[in-house]
């Protein structure tokens, strides 16, 4: 499969780590969220408890770091591969220490390659939720 969305559309329903092969890219392991808002989301950053240092150098962000079962950054090269060949929606979920949950969705999310310093492109805020 090319993406978590493709896995979801083909009957995979469990959250977890999967191997995908995005168009024109090498196979990568990703964490797929198959339960949030219909499922099929690729998680590219997760912060839980501060167990992983995110104050790292450019090369670490380029290649990715951490552990998909805990805190991690998937890697800028992988993000470019995931967003380069087709439209991708971005959803950002946040939860504070009191359990207050917020999210925002963008209809278009792109990450440029390393030559363009992984420039982020966002368009079209689709939905926002802030719970009291």
Residue positions per predicted region:
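Extracellular beta-rich globular recognition domains, centered on the fibrinogen C-terminal
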Residues: 1-132
């Amino acid at each position: 499969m090319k993406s978590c969305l493709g896995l979801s559309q083909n009957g995979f329903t469990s959250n977890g780590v999967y191997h995908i092969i995005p168009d024109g890219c090498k196979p990568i392991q990703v964490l797929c969220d198959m339960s949030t808002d219909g499922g099929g989301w690729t998680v590219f950053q997760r912060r839980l408890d501060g167990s992983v240092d995110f104050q790292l150098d450019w090369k670490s962000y380029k290649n990715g770091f951490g552990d998909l079962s805990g805190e991690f950054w998937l890697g800028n090269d992988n993000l470019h591969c995931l967003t380069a060949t087709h439209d991708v929606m971005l959803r950002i979920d946040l939860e504070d220490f009191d359990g207050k949950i917020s999210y925002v969705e963008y209809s278009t999310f792109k990450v440029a390659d390393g030559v363009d310093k992984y420039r982020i492109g966002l368009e079209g805020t689709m939905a926002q939720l802030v719970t009291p």
